[in-house]
Structure formats: C-alpha cells, structure tokens
C-alpha cells in the first residue's frame, strides 16, 4: 500500500514538472518582478522568472522599463524570452514560443 502511494506521488510530480508552466506560476512570477519596479521611477526592470518561467518571463520584462511618465524600452525577460515595451510607451510584452504577452 505504501509503495502505491509513493508511486502515485512520483507520477504527479513527474507530470507537474513536465508542464511548460504551472497554473498561475509563470504569470504571477513575471508580473510581480517587472511590474513592481517599472511603475515607480522608471529604473526598475527585473526579470520575471517565477516558478513556471514561460509566460511570466515575457510579461515581467514588459513592465520593467519606463516609469509613469517615461516610456522607453522595457527590461528584458528571463533568458530565452524577449524584451517588453515600457509602461506608457512601448506597448508589447516579450515573446515566448510565438505567443506575445500583453504590455502596459
């Protein structure tokens, strides 16, 4: 019985780790990292990594660059994900696997 429980848990972990990003993980990580710095004074970039990477990387980069009045280019996403636009000016998040994340 214990062996079956351990085997079941191992299967769940294997499937979860094979997913490109977990439910909400990638988006939450990226948005938190980039958004916090970008809206303040335009200096903060921050790579949106997050446990899931993926969508989170591109989205986090897009918020990073410009401040509230600034514009300018956004910070880079996590490695492999494109840079995003600045807060008021750039409009366009990073690319990840052909999907464009939304910039602000």
UniProtKB/Swiss-Prot annotation:
Whereabouts are the sequence repeats?
A: 27-30, 31-34, 35-38, 39-42, 43-46, 47-50, 51-54, 55-58, 59-62, 63-66, 67-70, 71-74, 75-78, 79-82, 83-86, 87-90, 91-94, 96-98
Region annotated 18 X 4 AA approximate tandem repeats of H-G-G-G, chain positions: 27-98
Keywords attached to this Swiss-Prot or TrEMBL record, sorted alphabetically, are: Antibiotic, Antimicrobial, Fungicide, Immunity, Innate immunity, Repeat, Secreted, Signal
Q: Which GO terms describe its cellular component?
A: extracellular region
From which residue to which does any coiled coil extend? none
The signal peptide annotation in the UniProt record is 1-20
Report the locations given in the UniProt record.
Secreted
- Region Disordered: list its residue ranges: 22-104
Q: What is its main location?
A: secreted
Please report which protein family the annotation says this sequence is part of.
To T.molitor tenecin 3.
UniProt name for this protein: Holotricin-3
Provenance organism: Holotrichia diomphalia (Korean black chafer)
Query: Taxonomy-wise, where does this protein's organism fall, top ranks first?
Result: Eukaryota, Metazoa, Ecdysozoa, Arthropoda, Hexapoda
């Amino acid at each position: 019985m214990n062996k079956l429980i351990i085997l079941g848990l191992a299967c769940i972990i294997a499937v979860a780790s094979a997913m490109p990003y977990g439910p909400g993980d990638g988006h939450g990580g990226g948005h938190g990292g980039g958004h916090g710095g970008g809206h303040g004074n335009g200096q903060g970039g921050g790579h949106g990594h997050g446990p899931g990477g993926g969508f989170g990387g591109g989205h986090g980069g897009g918020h990073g660059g410009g401040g509230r009045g600034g514009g300018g280019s956004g910070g880079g996403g996590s490695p492999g994900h494109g840079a995003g636009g600045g807060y008021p000016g750039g409009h366009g998040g990073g690319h990840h696997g052909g999907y464009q994340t939304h910039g602000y």
